[in-house]
């Protein structure tokens, strides 16, 4: 809720869609900044991937983000440019950020050589596991920290089995 009139809002945004995208961008930006910080932490690859994975799963499985994702998906029928913009700002940027980290780890010999973007997508898919779909379908409650830790530990284990040196 904004503490101002619609007129004031539309002085800044030309349409409801533009306002909606600005809100989405704001939420995506927080996760991107956290991921960048974790990727630049200079820690061990397993620990960095674990930290990024936990941050990501916590974010995408939270009640607020699940609700927003449902709204964005519903808007996609009416205005597909909104869902495309969301994908570019959210998941697309996340993959770019993680790809850059993975690429540098590959170049440093900490991960096996491969296609960094594909590896980043695979890592996020492993982190999503069943939980994101279950949350979107309201089949599960928001996960506890221990559940997130276990899911991400398994994702890192499987990822490192394929890309570890």
Residues covered by each model-derived region:
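Membrane-interface starts of transmembrane alpha-helices
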Residues: 112, 116-120
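Short amphipathic alpha-helical segment with a characteristic S/N-K-E followed by hydrophobic residues
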Residues: 15-20, 30, 82, 86
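Helix-turn-helix
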Residues: 1-18, 22
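C-terminal peripheral helix-coil segments that are non-catalytic and often amphipathic
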Residues: 51, 55, 96, 100-108, ...
